[in-house]
UniProtKB/Swiss-Prot annotation:
GO terms for molecular function: mRNA binding; structural constituent of ribosome. It comes from the Bacteria. This is Small ribosomal subunit protein bS1. Belongs to the bacterial ribosomal protein bS1 family. GO terms for cellular component: cytosolic small ribosomal subunit. It comes from Providencia sp.
Length: 378
């Protein structure tokens, strides 16, 4: 039987309830469907109770508010299950938070609001979006009537920011965004609510390809980036940071011509040549074959060491491939060309035999100039 009463006191194990002049006992476990420590908000109000025990001889009455709530919830639950449809919007109370989402009480039925369906932007923890006790409106994404499982969405209440994003941000567009996350391979930049793009580490700096993102930007920084590529289907945007800065390779190409003299310090020496540091933080390569006219590259390179100041001539600039070819020997005249200019065809010359093979002999005519004497001509 359901009766109306008022909670008017606290006793061991529960509370006292006045039922039209009759004193009843309300066990603490039967106040609500969930444990209630503080009943201040309930005291003094007329509430519905169900009599679960009545002993007239001992004048002992035990009531339950929980039974009334469960009965009402059951009716509400049945009605909700009957009317619930995928795609509809419903209101609910956030009941519990987990690392993967939030459980929402829709009225006798709990639905899961997964963390990936809370917002279009990256969410690290559900508490960033909702809190226990919040009343929220959600959309029913999936409803398994047999298993009574409901999947809910919050972000689906708004428009998907990825729709037609390529039209809003064509390749080459420059825009500002906020750095939201750093990884070893780059940084993520939010260019609008719910849309993040990746700036790969190779697109951060023109001259340092292996720099760690933390050396360039910090989380929270507002930066200018360029849209390099958009894959709407996979929801991926490639962004560039360095493209919003002047390209030192292009600048060098615009200010230097083939044959120009440049100077710099040796940054490194490898098996194939010498790298020279140039203005703008870029490097140029002197190949072994371009070190000396007279000495083999492997021997000539031994005359140099890292840190040496060195001059060279610009041989070729490929700004697109970020390559600059330099030459040291080109600072001096080519002895071969000089020899040809001074020696006419048919002239008799002298030389020193430096090598002999089955087909003939190699003859040094002058420093840096060799000729080959075939055996048939000897």
């Amino acid at each position: 039987e359901t009766v109306t009463g008022v909670i008017n006191g606290k006793v061991k194990g529960g509370f006292t309830v006045e039922l039209n002049g009759i004193r009843a006992f309300l066990p603490g476990s039967l106040v609500d469907v969930r444990p209630v420590r503080d009943t201040t908000h309930l005291e003094g109000k007329e509430l519905e109770f169900k009599v679960i025990k009545l002993d007239q001889k001992r004048n002992n009455v035990v009531v339950s508010r929980r039974a009334v709530i469960e009965s009402e919830s059951s009716a509400e639950r049945d009605q909700l299950l009957e009317n619930l449809q995928e795609g509809m919007e419903v209101k609910g109370i956030v009941k519990n938070l987990t690392d993967y989402g939030a459980f929402v009480d829709l009225g006798g039925v709990d639905g899961l609001l997964h963390i990936t369906d809370m917002a279009w932007k990256r969410v690290k923890h559900p508490s960033e979006i909702v809190n226990v006790g919040d009343e929220i409106t959600v959309k029913v994404l999936k409803f398994d009537r047999e298993r009574t499982r409901v999947s809910l969405g919050l972000k689906q209440l708004g428009e998907d920011p990825w729709v037609a994003i390529a039209k809003r941000y064509p390749e080459g567009t420059k825009l500002t965004g906020r750095v939201t996350n750093l990884t070893d391979y780059g940084c993520f930049v939010e260019i609008e609510e719910g849309v993040e793009g990746l700036v790969h580490v190779s697109e951060m700096d023109w001259t340092n390809k292996n720099i760690h993102p933390s050396k360039v930007v910090n989380v929270g920084d507002v930066v200018e980036v360029m849209v390099l590529d958009i894959d709407e289907e996979r929801r991926r945007i490639s962004l560039g940071l360095k493209q919003c800065k002047s390209n030192p390779w292009q600048q060098f190409a615009e200010t230097h011509n083939k044959g120009d003299r440049v100077e710099g310090k040796i940054k490194s020496i490898t098996d194939f040549g010498i790298f020279i540091g140039l203005e703008g933080g870029i490097d140029g390569l002197v190949h072994l074959s371009d070190i000396s006219w007279n000495v083999a590259g492997e021997e000539a390179v031994r005359e140099y060491k890292k840190g040496d100041e060195i001059a060279a001539v610009v041989l070729q600039v490929d700004a697109e491939r970020e390559r600059i070819s330099l030459g040291v020997k080109q600072l001096a005249e080519d002895p071969f060309n000089n020899y040809l200019a001074a020696t006419k065809k048919g002239a008799i010359v002298t030389g020193k035999v430096t090598a002999v093979d089955a087909k003939g002999a190699t003859v040094e005519l002058t420093l840096g100039v060799e000729g080959y004497l075939r055996a048939s001509e000897a």
